[in-house]
Amino acid sequence: MLEEKYSFREIEDKYNILWEGSKVYKWSSEKGNTFTIDTPPPTISGKLHIGHIFSYCHTDFIARFQRMLGKDVFYPIGFDDNGLPTERLVEQTYRTRAKEVGREKFIEMCHEVIEKSKQEFKELFKSVGISYDWSLEYHTISKEAVALSQMSFVDLYNKGYAYRKMQPILWDPVDKTAIAQAEIEDKVFESSLNTIVFATEENEQIKIATTRPELLPACVAVFCHPEDELYTQLIGKIAIVAITGARVPIIADDKVKIDKGTGLVMCCTFGDELDIYWQQKHGLPMKIIIDQDGRISLDSVYGNNRSQCQGTGMTKGSDIPVLDTGIQPLEETHAPARDAGIYDEINGLKVKEARKKIIEILTEKGLLIESTNIFHSVKCAERSGAPLEILPTYQWFIKTLEQKTQVLDKVRECSWHPESMRKRMEVWVEGLSWDWCISRQRYFGVPFPVWHSKRKGEEGKIILAEVKGLPIDPLKDLPKGYSKEEIIPDQDVMDTWATSAITPQLSALAVNSELGLPSHRYDKIFPADLRSQSHEIIRTWAFYTILKAHYHADSLPWKNIMISGWCLADDKKKMSKSKGNIITPHVILETYGADVVRYWAANSRLGVDTVYSENIFKIGKRLVTKLWNASKFVSMFMERHQGLSINSISETMDKWILSKLYKVIEKTTNNLLQFEYCEALSAIEEFFWKDFCDNYLELVKKRAYGDALDSEANMSAKQSLAYVLNIILRLFAPFLPYITEEIYHQLYSYNSVHNKSNWPNKEELIYDKYSEEMGDNFVQILNLVRKIKADNNVSVKHLIQKLMIKASVKEDELNYSAQHDLQSVCNAEVIEWVESTEAELITENGKFTVSLLIDVT
């Protein structure tokens, strides 16, 4: 019934077509019995690598298990195809910048690129057997997703959780957009710590160490610790900034670290978050000398020129009033920098170039005391890798800081798998210092459903789109009752996380029970049962999703969250195109097949990074081959699609294998209910190799072939083989869907092994404690016999004239049925239970002593 060799390419093609046609994975909207999975939508950002398969397989193991358990599984796939990652891919593909081609043309280019990338993802997911219901596919830039994302924003704004404000934010000078705190990564760079001479009005020299001397023109104060005896006499005096000659106050603040640098710190607007804190706490002026391109712009020292408002629709003198930021107006002009002769030297330079130039000027003027080479951590944009600047601009924010306690309660209410990952989220939430900036100065994203009024008497008023009219594009559409001349459309787009943070709601087609699309299914699938994702986006995707569900419905978005680790390259680093360490999935799939790739993915524990290992693929291939060969052997003793009956299983060792299998079903079911797929596979695999193949198939062979005269024992063997293999296939099915389907079809049924309610139930088996203990004793004795033969270079098949066994306890002696199988598998003419033995070929394990009488001549 089974071919000589398993041809994975033919089988995979066959069942991919069959599964799609039969809709075996389709959700049937069965209320009350649905298991909903919030699937991570892959980002459309570049070429695929083996890591893309890694965690998606983990989710599929659970989806297939739950389906076989009897659940109506809601298993969608989405594509996160809007936002900065997609824009960067398009810019790289066409070797252009978004602003060079214009909004409309660039958006067209984005749609072209994402369509091709989506097809590549689809082919990959199908080729590895991911059991999505493709009719539930969604896209974060689709009309429905944009409508829901805009609904989410409107709901948050109306509830007071979304707001717009001019304030210092993290700015990416490469992608020219604001970014959120969660999109930062710390990188270590080589730099220099420069000790610079300032002066006081009394002409007293003071020394300040800094890694950013290019910010000297932005210096607005000098700080010392109030208890630093070296500098207490300076508090309240005026410092003269090196090179620029600007006069700034010397202020005491306990956030200064006495043991860092010289103990004196210059506050520049803005070098880091501490500068923001000091500027706002002490009411200092702002001197913004870096523009949105990452260049020195001394003309913009007031922070009010057009370049600082570029891309936001806001400029000085526009009809939209400036919001109250609590920032004191400038008292200095930029004249000191001009007068000091550095204006022409550094104006227009990139930050790094300006730093080098300033150091040269300081050296020439004798104001650089010391320059020490150091390595230090710099905050960079996660996407572009560029060092970030802090610039004051108008942005949209979602409140996070005032709801930290409530969000932490939600985090603790959710079940985390593994539990250790919950702590990672708690640490992140507790350490938050910024509200979530959700606006981006880009093109390809969800537009804010907002206009700003120019109508007389309501200048600057925010006009929200009506929910029933969503989705809208404020650049093309008008608010009800307003003319084009009376409004300014908001030109920003939402952070891509602002949309992907509502993936449970995108699947439900509603933001909450009161706000959704007409055809919503919110009451059927929200909250979801499971969110699966990798650990590096806990602080983004997991956090933002919990936050939004809390705001929209005071609910968890899902009951369980399952966290995968990374698939690391051979160099133990995360796979990435830029590092040149990616492994193409298509090559691996062509070499080993989908089941082996899935086996590799299943051999990683939740939350643990796994180094790519070719050896695991080889082990997986060996397992697939063994499963095929074992099935071929069993097929010799059964009719195709024969009925299975446990009632005719009568022999001790047959009951032993059933009892072992009973415990495996119990363990693997519990493992998978806790999302521990790795532990489940390990238990199945151990049973298959050790109990079934190494021991049971060997001991039952002769009885199955009918060598024995006992027809009842022969029938017991055949039924046991067919029965056990059937359950083995169903246990392996979530992990190895192709080979199990083929064997199941050929031997057992035309129905799919993956059908609902086809997971093995331990009630299908008989647990016989006596037979299990008897069988375990049997295996111990068999292993001792094998050891003696191996140690003495005697063939396993070599005839034993007499097998003598001493049991430490009389009750451990085998019964007639088991002893008969032992005699067959050991090829022994006689088995004798003895009180003592002095044979030459002997070994023992504490429970049994075994000796052999063999003619080796």
Describe the residue ranges of each PLM region.
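N-terminal, positively charged nucleic-acid-binding surface of large information/translation enzymes
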Residues: M1-E227, I251, C268-K281, P285-V301, ...
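Feature 926 captures the class I aminoacyl-tRNA synthetase adenylation module centered on the KMSKS loop
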Residues: T195, A340, L432-A498, I502, ...
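Structured ligand/cofactor/substrate-binding pocket environments in proteins
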Residues: G51-A63, K71, F79-D80, A145-L148, ...
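Secondary-structure transition/capping motifs at alpha-helix termini
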Residues: R64-D72, T93-R103, E123, S127-Y132, ...
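Short Cys/His-rich metal-coordination motifs, predominantly Zn2+-binding knuckles/fingers
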Residues: D175, T244, S384-G385, K454-E459, ...
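Active-site-adjacent bridging/hinge elements
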Residues: K31-T39, F61, Y94-A98, K122-G129, ...
